[in-house]
Curated annotation (Swiss-Prot):
Residues 91-100 have a biased composition (Gly residues). This is UPF0229 protein LPC_3097. Residues 83-107 are annotated as: Disordered. SUPFAM superfamilies: vWA-like (SSF53300). Pfam families: DUF444.
Length: 420
């Protein structure tokens, strides 16, 4: 019998190669559409696909066709209305338009619309972050473990005895050991009953059968009801498992020195952190805190796009952060992560208080604190006090970001797996 081996990498989708060629050819137009889509999305919706619209004029390809000039004489077969030399007026046509009213002239064409998959969308969105291909598919994760049942075993502690399986094992053993004697007992009893029905039975045969019956009964009775070899114990193993829930605090400085470019870098960093956490936890909650001289909890829209601004007092955000944790997210039930983005500016007298808040109140409650400073490397007082916090707490990490291309290398450094 013949067999066909298909080594094509299209996974049953015959248009995969054409689709990839299309994405490469119109990459600039698609990336522009992706960037516009990201601006309209929530952080929690960033890992979904997207419907992309490209103007028809942008995907126009040059083609060979007959020119409009010159003199052409044509006689069509079966024509009885025209003869050679007759001039036929070109028919008019309606122009395509985007409005609701029809046009009285010209031609038009609809925009080209197609769906980007989740993988294609993320590939294009994170391309300028210089993500390694393997890391795009699976970010490094810090696993927790849980104990799960993995069948039964013949050894263990009394607390783990599986009574049902042990009794089934004992029943099977008793049946296996007693069955031969029960069979011979039944045969002996039937033979004894047959001999007793005779007029003159042989007394020696009767005595022998009675002794055999007594022997078989004793053998059956000596089979123990349960033995140590019958015992079965529940077997449990430790397997990697995501913790049930986590909360991610996004803290951002919105003072006058944080322009839109810096806020865009911060948003991309927060998106990466959110995607990292969703791979490790079943339930993620987001808390957005923005601050200048004062801090407040806001929704995502206000967090990124509000025009409120002012000076810089970082401690106001840390105080609010601590208050929210104490009120809503007990560390015993939540894995708490904090990501703070700032340009490093802070009122000098406030920085020591920030250090005190972090060291004495906040850091003991957290799973991880990641601080990114978005500016060239001339650091101020906030960076200096944060370095002292980093020396005391290994779960405090801080890095500097100069431009968009630095986001992922910094993220990888902050969240890489720690070797023992």
């Amino acid at each position: 019998m013949s067999q066909l081996i298909d080594r094509r990498q299209n996974a049953g989708k015959k248009s995969t190669v054409n689709r990839q060629r299309f994405l490469r050819r119109y990459k600039s137009q698609i990336k522009k559409a992706v960037s516009e889509a990201v601006g309209k999305r929530s952080i929690t919706e960033i890992d979904q696909g997207e419907q992309i619209t490209i103007p028809a004029k942008d995907i126009y390809e040059p083609q060979f066709h007959r020119g409009h000039g010159g003199h052409i004489e044509r006689v069509l077969p079966g024509n009885d209305n025209f003869i050679a030399g007759d001039r036929i007026k070109r028919p008019g046509g309606g122009a395509g338009g985007a409005g609701g009213n029809a046009s009285d002239s010209g031609e038009g064409e609809d925009n080209f619309v197609f769906e980007l998959s989740r993988e294609e969308f993320l590939e294009l969105y994170f391309e300028d972050l210089e993500l390694p291909d393997l890391v795009k598919k699976e970010l490094a994760r810090i696993s927790t473990y849980k104990t799960v049942r993995a069948g039964v075993t013949t050894s263990g502690i009394p607390n783990n005895i599986n009574v049902l399986r042990s009794m089934k094992q004992a029943t099977g053993r008793r049946v296996a050991l007693a069955s031969p004697y029960k069979k011979r007992l039944k045969e002996a009893e039937e033979e004894l009953e047959r001999l007793k029905q005779l007029t003159n039975p042989d007394k020696i045969d009767l005595l022998k059968l009675e002794r055999d019956i007594e022997f078989f009964k004793k053998k059956i009775q000596t089979v123990p009801f349960i033995d140590t070899i019958d015992l079965r114990y529940n077997h449990r193993v430790r397997v990697p498992s995501p913790s049930t829930q986590a909360v991610m605090f996004c803290v951002m400085d919105v003072s006058g020195s944080m322009d839109e470019a810096k806020k865009d870098i911060a948003k991309r960093f927060f998106i990466l952190l959110y995607m990292f956490l969703t791979k490790n936890y079943e339930k993620i909650e987001l808390v957005f805190i923005r601050h200048h001289t004062s801090a407040k909890e806001v929704n995502e829209e206000e967090f990124f796009y509000s025009r409120e601004t002012g000076g810089t007092v970082v401690s106001s955000a840390l105080e609010l952060l601590n208050t929210i944790i104490e009120a809503r997210y007990p560390p015993q039930a939540w894995n708490i992560y904090v990501a703070q983005a700032s340009d490093g500016d802070n009122w000098n007298a406030d920085s020591p208080y920030c250090q005190e808040l972090l060291q004495e109140k906040i850091m003991p409650l957290l799973q991880y604190f990641a601080y990114i400073e978005i500016m060239p490397r001339h650091h101020q007082s906030l960076w200096e006090v944060y370095q002292q916090v980093k020396e005391r707490y290994p779960n405090f990490a801080m890095e500097n970001i100069d431009n968009v291309a630095d986001i992922y290398p910094v993220f990888r450094e902050l969240f890489k797996r720690k070797t023992v």
